[in-house]
Swiss-Prot record:
This is C-myc promoter-binding protein. The keyword Repeat applies. Residues 936-949 have a biased composition (Low complexity). SMART domains: dDENN, DENN, uDENN. GO terms for molecular function: DNA binding; guanyl-nucleotide exchange factor activity. Induction: By serum in low-passage fibroblasts. Residues 192-364 form the uDENN domain.
């Protein structure tokens, strides 16, 4: 076996002929049936004569008179003439002289005699032989041509003659040629025609079955063995020994072609040349001598005869390069009969087979020089969805004419038995191949033998339809079977027998047939002009005729036009057939695959023209049509072809002119690029000697193996290797590949939309989604829960639809359907089909095939509904009714501004989590049906609502108000929008409700209000606010609304929550003063429905009605980056601890309920975090006891005392994060401030990130009630006197130093943390004193466990939850919270929920200065994604990430030096998918934009993020221990706190309550001096935030800080150490990466090319990062941009680029995306060249007093604090002109430098940072900016640059569509 390596020009070279074992052909052929009547061979006709019977002339001796026609009429040549004589034709047979080769008729009065012809001038009796009578002036004569004396043995001679009278219904007999001239030209009588038959006039021949003489290569290829029957096809009439007269000429070689069809319908093409060679008389047996007539009767031999035999050389290939093969074989034949030669013939054969490359799009033409005089050209096969064919339509039309060609089409489409015959074997193959091509899209399903050997002719007896081509000499031996329609290509006649005679082209539908005939007639005339050459009679000239290249091209074009005409016809008669296909939409029955089930046949027939029902009935009953319907309905290798046909049908449908082109040549055909291949090299001898001419042949030799020149390794067979993919082009389409029609259609759409700004941005978006779906198989593959991943993709589809991308790419639906089939999800496949129909897309054949395959072959869920399900239904109804009642009771307390639309559609969950975990198909699928409706408007990873301003632009109306800063009352559509979205979920969702309480419902409701776009009006719950002292981050409307309501009535916390939504967190201290819970409810049910958790594995999306999803969207505003929190919450980070729980109980909790986090009360009571634990302790013990008795009791029974607590819980849930409750958050600390105690709302200075990520983390359900700990009589100040992370802890540094180096696999924290948690927690519950001791004892251990990995216990807890793949628990992120929350103290709760919901932790996210937005949504499945998508505290966050990636697309134009931002780059791209450039919006020049990527390696010894087990990469913890592991304490070391966010140095005593209250602004951690020095010496740079707008708020400027050095591509504040104190433990960060930023159109093309060349697995391995960085980083950017989950970020972890310095084997490293934090930046400080800093950085420097930027103030006095504040004030007043003027005025003072930054960006970015991103309506800003720009005075205009111009519509549309990256 030889290994296959891509397509080959030729597979085998074969020599066939007479072998020693050949048997006589007559022994081999046995036709036992009656069809094959043996015909008697007839001698050739040597003479023809005319006799006039009316004058008494008689038939001469040995002549035969033709008295009657074939049907018995008189054969008088003047038939019916009144006055003409009766003239008859006579002929004589014999071998005494050369036979006649042609007959003709001469009209003497208007024609001349052709050369070589003779006239029969007189009768045998001397009278004139004028057929029209001697009296007529118009004389007509019979003419003939005779063969030469030394004629070749295969000369065709006339063997039969007849007369026909067509007017009497006669036609030429089979194989007879009609002379198309009427012999009777009198006024009376019928037209009379002469017909004759020609055959080979051979004598003395013995035929044998041909055998294989030799072959090359000797070994078979893996995918294609040499068929045994090849010699039979090489010599179809057998190998013969012939006896010739000695003066006979050698016949020229005959070229023939044949096609072999394998069992899999794969075609192999053969090209052969037959020739004769002398045969030694000595080798003849006596019998052979007798048969050949060499021995006379008296025993003497005849010496005047010579003996010859025929031989054939042949090439076999999968590609029909017939013309090239003909030239090569002819060259070999000539080489064998000439010589001597330097090189052996074997060298030429192996050179052609191995050294000639296969033509490809890159090298469409290969010119092969065979010798100085011989060459050939190989052209790339036309890359078309049409089946590959060796036929030529021009040959068919030229030989048969339009009418017979169309009649042949009718025979084929109605499945007749078709026998095509000719004496020219190459023409035979050409015509039959063209015939099976012209019936496309049907594929001939029956026997098909284009050139049938005589030995296989019994196929003609087959009882089924067939298409067989046969040599016409067959009819010299046999009569044709009676039920076969015979087509004689040589004479252009079709003979039908019996009832088949009525089947002709006229039964076809009239209009399509008329169009077809017109086109064919026109092309037939063109062919006649083009082909003025004599008809090829099967013989070849020795000189290779290179006919004019242009003529060849023209012939090829005519060929395509003929094919297109037939294609147009087929598309016309089948128009609209797809609408009659019936998809399988339910569990398939036994008859599901019957054609009757798959196709509405009767409806189809009724839709056709009634007058042609006969034809349609015949066609639809054929096997071919039924097969066609099956192929359309299921996956087959014909899918690409069928999709192409559907495209043709659409074109025919639309086309009115008839000028549409259905077949378009691809560009490579037009290319002139040609590769030249030289002849084999002649060996060079020393001293310049001539090589000897040692090879000469006296016939074609038997090939010698040792003379072949084989390529290296050619014979090394690969054993045990599966046959590789065949080189045949008919393999099914790979999953990712679009059809050519889809690619062309996408190009057209892109071209059309590129000039329409609104549509261009959507076009780019459409391509981005398409890219994600192409990568979807790789993503699903790594997801633990395939079902969730698929549902995520389904949600993305729905989201695409909501974005009104017209139309979405069909490949997206197709890939998802394929995956549904692959992973057994038929119900989802049905939904995808319905979504497709909803989007207005008719699935093409490929998509439809994969759909039916998915629903047919997958296992459908059982239909029986369990008792559990039915009882759950009853329970839900009861609960639903109750909740409605309670909601009504409390309705009076709800603010009028609340929206009632969202309450009923929150998707209550009726599935237990156990069921979800099990993936119970029955319930799951039942649920799916309901869930489907609920999640219509959301999809995944909150991405719908996360896209800055215009994610759902097409769907939602924009703000009408032109107010830049969003205020109350400006929104007309926000409420409507929300209700519109939420109401898509119908009331039936009530039937799957969970144990939700009314409060919970309201809680959700309040969060629901927040789901809308940041660029949309933010007015749901906001009242207008006075901007006075309001901190820039506070959502003013919320606060004011809160205060106004308090005036009218005493609002309950629930009301406040309703009002505040996400902004509630900022006001936590205000509320906590006034309320405190009566009881701590811990039995709250989970908020999440199954629908919520559907996608947890594969996405971060909680589906639309998950409250936290709503909140997360809006919570951006206040919650994400609360910098003060960072300082204040350090203590808490130390303290989180977790209760022990019975794993079994936890499991039950999973399935039944989850607990609300506890209230955090008066901060002042106990500053030690543990002091906050006390109140929960008793409640916890009590609850645990109850739970041990009966879990469900506490679940289902709402507590009577719970109302107020519920309100608070609800309120706090909306704001807090798990980690924060462990510390008095800055909000709460500020509550201790006197001003805050006066409840002066504007004073709440929650320093929040102003430029927020599009999807902020979801708020965790953690309450922070200030008064909470007051329930404890004794403050527990001393309880946590020595926390592990206490800055004063003497062991800290030592412990880190000693333990960090311990083996990563054997680490204290991995051993101790869960057990310590258990121990500690149980001790806490035992009593206060014990708890105090436990705290001290535990803190010492935590010091070791956490510090050894630098907070690895925190990482452990976080990653354990994240890593705990959601497949195992089927929980959403919140579910994990709940399952951990149980009866636990608030501290424990916060810790555990924090572990899970990193996303919500304020410590983590809000304060995470480094967080550029919710973390990468690329996380791998489930929790892992959630975890990765969001961040724990700044300190904690990087404990859960191995890698942080910062990407900016901001680029600099090379021409004008202006900074071009993301949306401007997008707007400048073109529709050309080969153009990498964009157009600069400022100077109009093109340039190549770049993505700048910086990677921070956060790994260190002990936390390398290795794969946990080979089997389940994502399941880091077995479920049995997961609950405890996940609950490990989230403790944050000082170094941890300092990592990446803020190394804060403040001097104050942690234990001093009063001092703390005074210093609430900067609670920071003291760093031991020596540690500090080390850290600082190693890292002179201040640890920087990843976002310039989130730098830490520090009271004092640290004078010891050194000046910042810009090291990266990001703003200065984005650089620096992520862990200044722990820097020595980090691996070096990988080098920055810069790659071209490509349009999605270009990326798609590149990705397809990559997948095609390297396979689907290419994007699942880390080498993708290293080998294809451009495609990789662009994909990462786009997926992150749209918040789509992906496996790609995980590949960074094990890539070569990121592991240059790592000693750990890459295959051991985790590739889980949850460990990679990806942040997208709008700006790129590295590119800034202006001397000053951007205004938004200066704003932070001035207003936030960031030490890191204080130095900027000294060098940058132009823009002082007052100036910036006045600008911001102007912007609040909708005045952009003022700031513009101020900036221009300031800049004019130093006119010497060339300004690079634009006014637009300066003012916009300042607005976003100063006023909060969520408060700025950028659309309104753009309007105001344009108006202000138009107002500029001429002198001001002179100071502006091009980059100051307002953004164009295209730029604005791209920003709206894709949202804004982060500052």
């Amino acid at each position: 076996m030889i290994e296959d390596k891509g397509p080959r020009v030729a597979d085998y070279f074969v020599v066939a002929g007479l072998t020693d074992v050949s048997k006589p052909l007559e022994e081999e052929i046995h036709f036992n049936d009656a069809c094959h009547k043996v015909a008697k061979p007839k001698e050739p006709i040597t003479d023809v004569s005319v006799i006039i019977k009316s004058l008494g002339e008689e038939v001469p001796q040995d002549y035969i008179c033709i008295d009657v026609t074939p049907t018995g009429l008189s054969a008088d040549l003047n038939n019916g003439s009144l006055v003409g004589p009766q003239i008859y034709l006579c002929y004589r047979r014999g071998r005494d002289k050369p036979p006649l080769t042609d007959l003709g008729v001469l009209y003497d009065w208007k024609e001349r005699l052709k050369q070589g012809c003779e006239i029969i001038q007189s009768t045998p009796y001397g009278r004139p032989a004028n057929i029209s009578g001697s009296t007529s002036s118009q004389r007509i004569y019979i003419t003939y041509r005779r063969a030469s004396e030394n004629m070749t043995q295969n000369t065709l001679a006339v063997t039969d003659i007849c007369i026909i009278i067509p007017s009497k219904g006669e036609s030429p007999p089979h194989t007879f040629c009609k002379v198309d001239k009427n012999l009777n030209n009198s006024m009376w009588g019928s037209a009379v025609y002469l017909c004759y038959k020609k055959s080979v006039a051979k004598t003395n021949t013995v035929s044998y079955k041909a055998g294989l003489i030799c072959r090359y290569p000797q070994e078979d290829y893996e995918s294609f063995s040499l068929p045994e029957s090849v010699p039979l096809f090489c010599l179809p009439m057998g190998a013969t020994i012939e006896c010739w007269p000695s003066n006979s000429k050698y016949p020229l070689p005959v070229f023939s072609t044949f096609v072999l069809t394998g069992a899999s319908a794969e075609k192999v093409y053969g090209a052969a040349i037959q020739f004769y060679e002398p045969y030694s008389e000595e080798n003849l047996t006596e019998k052979q001598r007798l048969l050949l007539g060499l021995t006379s009767a008296d025993g003497k031999s005849d010496s005047s005869k010579t003996i010859h035999t025929n031989k054939c050389i042949c090439l076999l290939s999968h590609w029909p390069f017939f013309d090239a093969f003909r030239k090569f074989l002819t060259f070999l034949y000539r080489y064998s009969i000439s010589g001597p030669h330097v090189l052996p013939i074997e060298k030429h054969i192996s050179h052609f087979m191995h050294k000639v490359p296969f033509p490809s799009p890159q090298r469409p033409r290969i010119l092969v020089q065979l010798s100085p005089h011989d060459n050939l050209i190989l052209s790339q096969p036309v890359s078309s969805p049409l089946p590959l064919s060796g036929g030529k339509f021009s040959t068919l039309l030229q030989n048969l004419g339009p009418e017979n060609a169309v009649t042949l089409l009718v025979f084929a489409v109605t499945e007749h038995k078709i026998l095509i015959h000719s004496l020219r074997p190459s023409v035979l193959t050409s015509v039959t191949e063209a015939l099976v091509s012209m019936i496309f899209p049907f594929h001939w399903p029956c026997p098909y033998v284009p050139l049938c050997p005589l030995a296989l002719a019994d196929v003609l007896s087959a009882p089924c339809p067939f298409i067989v081509g046969i040599d016409s000499r067959y009819f010299d031996l046999y009569d044709p079977p009676p039920d076969v329609s015979c087509v004689d290509v040589d004479t252009n006649t079709i003979s039908q027998i019996g009832d088949k005679k009525n089947v002709a082209w006229k039964i076809l539908p009239k209009k399509p047939c008329k169009n077809l005939m017109n086109t064919l007639n026109n092309l037939h005339q063109q062919l006649a002009k083009l082909q003025q050459r004599p008809r090829d009679d099967g013989l070849m000239d020795l000189a290779i005729n290179d006919y004019d290249f242009n003529s060849g091209k023209r012939l090829h074009m005519i060929d395509l036009e003929i094919q297109e005409a037939f294609l147009f016809f087929m598309a016309s008669i089948l128009k609209g057939y797809r609408s009659y296909l019936r998809p399988i939409t339910q569990a398939p029955s036994e008859t599901a695959t019957d054609a009757a089930s798959l196709f509405a046949l009767q409806a189809f027939l009724r839709s056709r023209d009634r007058s042609h029902q006969k034809f349609y009935n015949m066609m639809t009953k054929t096997q071919m049509f039924i097969r066609f319907i099956e192929e359309c309905s299921f996956v087959s290798d014909k899918d690409a072809s069928l999709a192409f046909f559907d495209d043709c049908v659409d074109k025919v449908d639309m086309d009115k002119s008839g000028e549409v082109r259905l077949i378009e040549l691809d560009e490579s055909f037009k290319s002139e690029h040609t590769v030249f291949v030289t002849p084999p090299e002649i060996p060079h001898l020393p001293n310049g000697e001539e090589p000897p001419l040692q090879y000469s042949y006296n016939g074609f030799p038997v090939l010698r193996n040792n003379l072949f020149e084989r390529p290296e390794g050619f014979l090394q067979a690969k054993k045990n290797k599966l046959p590789s993919k065949s080189s045949s082009p008919n393999s099914p389409l790979p999953m990712f590949r679009r059809t050519k029609q889809e690619i062309k259609s996408a190009h057209k759409i892109a071209k059309r939309y590129s000039s329409i700004p609104q549509m261009w941005s959507r076009c780019l978006l459409r391509h981005c989604y398409g890219l994600w779906f192409i990568c979807l198989p790789a993503y699903v593959k790594v997801c633990h829960s395939k079902v969730r991943a698929l549902k995520t993709a389904y949600d993305v589809l729905k989201k695409m639809q909501s974005k009104k991308m017209d139309p979405p790419d069909e490949v997206c639906y197709r890939i998802l359907m394929q995956l549904c089939g692959q992973y057994d999800q038929p119900v989802l496949a049905v939904r995808v089909l319905f979504e497709m129909q909803k989007a207005g897309i008719d699935p093409n054949a490929i998509t439809y095939g994969y759909y039916n395959k998915a629903v047919l072959e997958s296992t459908w869920p059982s239909r029986s509904r369990s008792g559990y399900f039915l009882w759950t239904k009853v329970r839900n109804v009861v609960l639903g009714v109750t909740q409605f009642k309670r909601a009504l009771k409390k309705h009076a307390h709800l603010s009028q501004t609340t929206l009632s639309g969202g309450q009923s559609d929150l998707g209550y969950n009726s599935l237990s989590k156990d069921e979800v975990r099990r993936g119970d198909t029955s319930t799951e699928d039942i649920q799916e049906e309901k869930d489907k409706k609920g999640s219509d408007c959301s999809s995944l990873s909150e991405s719908e609502s996360t896209k800055g301003s215009a994610d759902c632009l097409p769907k939602l109306s924009y703000q009408n108000s032109s107010s830049i800063v969003r205020l109350t009352g400006t929104s007309n559509n926000s409420a409507g929008k929300i209700s519109g979205e939420s109401m898509e979920s119908t009331p039936e969702l009530l039937l799957i409700s969970s144990l939700e309480d009314t409060n919970e419902t309201r809680n959700i409701q309040s969060r629901c209000f927040r789901k809308r776009h940041k660029s949309d009006n933010e007015t749901n719950l906001q009242q207008q606010v006075v901007w006075g002292n309001r901190n820039r981050n506070l959502s003013g409307g919320v606060l004011m609304g809160f205060m106004l309501n308090r005036i009218n009535q005493e609002a309950t916390p629930g009301d406040i929550v309703e009002k505040l939504g996400a902004d509630a967190k900022i006001l936590s201290n205000v509320i906590s003063k006034s309320t405190r819970p009566n009881t701590l409810d811990i039995g709250k049910p989970p908020l999440r429905s199954k629908r919520d958790s559907l996608e947890k594995e594969s996405s971060d999306d909680d589906t639309p009605f998950d409250g936290s999803n709503y909140l997360a969207d809006k919570v951006d505003s206040p919650v994400i980056f609360d910098l003060e929190d960072l300082d204040s919450e350090t203590d808490v980070s130390k303290a989180g601890c977790v209760a022990t729980q019975n794993p079994k109980r936890i499991q039950r909790m999973n399935s039944s309920f989850s607990v609300k986090p506890f209230e955090k009360t008066d901060v002042a009571t106990g500053f030690d975090p543990l002091s906050l634990l006390v109140a929960e302790t008793e409640q916890q013990q009590k609850e645990e006891e109850e739970e041990d008795e009966d879990d469900s009791k506490s679940i289902s029974t709402p507590s009577a005392r719970r109302d107020l607590a519920e309100e608070i819980v609800m309120y706090m849930n909306n704001m807090s994060s798990p980690l924060t409750s462990r510390t008095p958050s800055i909000d709460l600390q500020r509550a201790c401030d006197d001003k805050l105690n006066k409840k002066s709302p504007p004073l709440v200075k929650a320093c929040r990130r102003s430029s927020l990520p599009p999807n902020s983390p979801k708020p965790v359900r953690l309450t922070k009630s200030k008064s909470y700990t007051k329930s404890e009589e004794k403050p527990r100040d001393r309880l946590w006197s020595s926390p592990a992370f206490s800055p004063t802890c003497p062991f800290r540094e030592e412990s880190q130093d000693t333990l960090t180096h311990s083996s990563p696999s054997f680490n204290l924290d991995t051993l101790l943390v869960p057990k310590l948690d258990v121990l500690r927690n149980s001790m806490f519950t035992a009593g206060k004193g014990v708890a105090e001791k436990a705290s001290k004892w535990y803190s010492r251990f935590t010091m070791y466990t956490t510090s050894s990995k630098d907070q690895s216990s925190d990482r452990t807890s976080l990653s354990s939850v994240g890593a705990q793949d959601s497949e195992s628990t089927s929980l959403t992120d919140e579910d994990v919270c709940h399952e951990l929350e149980g009866p636990i103290s608030s501290q424990e709760t916060s810790a555990t929920s924090g572990t899970k919901r990193i996303d919500l932790s304020r410590i983590s996210l809000e304060s995470s200065a480094s967080l550029e937005g919710s973390l990468s949504k690329f996380a791998l499945p489930g929790k892992s994604e959630v975890t990765s998508s969001f961040n724990a505290s700044n300190t904690n966050i990087f404990q859960n990430y191995a890698m942080e990636v910062l990407i900016s697309s901001c680029s600099r134009c090379r021409t004008c030096d202006c900074l071009v931002h993301d949306e401007e780059i997008m707007a400048g791209w073109t529709a050309d998918d080969s153009n990498l450039n964009t157009t600069c919006p400022f100077c109009g020049n093109i340039f190549l934009p770049f993505l700048n990527i910086e990677i921070r390696d956060l790994r260190r010894p002990g936390r390398y993020f290795l794969k946990s087990s080979p089997s389940t990469e994502n399941m880091h913890f077995p479920s049995s221990i997961s609950s405890q592991t996940r609950q490990s304490c989230i403790s944050t070391s000082a170094s941890g706190l300092d990592t990446s966010a803020l190394s804060v140095q403040g001097n104050f005593d942690l234990n001093s309550k009063s001092k703390l209250q005074e210093n609430f602004c900067t609670r920071s951690i003291q760093i031991p001096a020596n540690r500090s020095k080390t850290a600082m010496s190693k890292c002179p740079i201040f640890p920087m935030a990843r976002s310039i707008s989130t730098s830490g708020p520090l009271d004092k400027e640290d004078t010891g800080r050194q000046k910042l050095i810009s090291t990266g591509s990001l703003p200065a504040t984005l650089q620096g150490a992520t862990d200044s104190l722990g820097l020595e433990w980090h691996l070096p960060s990988p080098d920055p990466v810069t790659v071209p930023y490509l349009s999605p159109l270009v990326v798609w093309k590149e990705l397809e090319s990559l997948l095609e060349n390297e396979g689907d697995h290419a994007i699942t391995v880390a080498d993708f990062v290293d080998h294809h960085p451009i495609v990789f980083w662009n994909l990462v950017w786009y997926f992150r941009r749209l918040d789509l989950p992906s496996n790609l970020p995980g590949l960074i972890l094990s890539s070569e680029h990121c592991n240059k310095y790592s000693k750990i084997p890459r295959h051991c490293m985790s590739e889980d995306s949850k460990y990679v934090l990806i942040q997208m930046l709008w700006d790129n400080m590295k590119l800034h060249q202006d001397p000053g800093q951007p205004l938004y950085i200066l704003w932070n420097a001035h207003t936030q007093k960031y030490p890191m930027v204080h130095l900027l103030q000294k060098s940058d006095n132009s823009f002082n604090q007052e100036l910036l504040k006045s600008m911001v004030k102007s912007i609040k007043m909708n005045d952009v002109y003022g700031p513009m003027s101020q900036i221009l005025e300031t800049l004019n003072k130093c006119p010497h430098f060339k300004r690079q930054r634009s006014l637009y960006r300066e003012i916009l970015f300042l607005s976003l940072v100063a006023l909060g991103r969520e408060n700025i309506d950028i659309d309104a800003f753009d309007k105001e900016y344009k108006m202000a720009y138009d107002r500029l005075t001429p002198s001001q205009v002179k100071s502006t640059h091009n980059c100051d111009r307002p953004p164009s519509t295209g730029v604005m549309e791209c920003r709206k569509t894709f949202g804004e990256p982060y500052l």
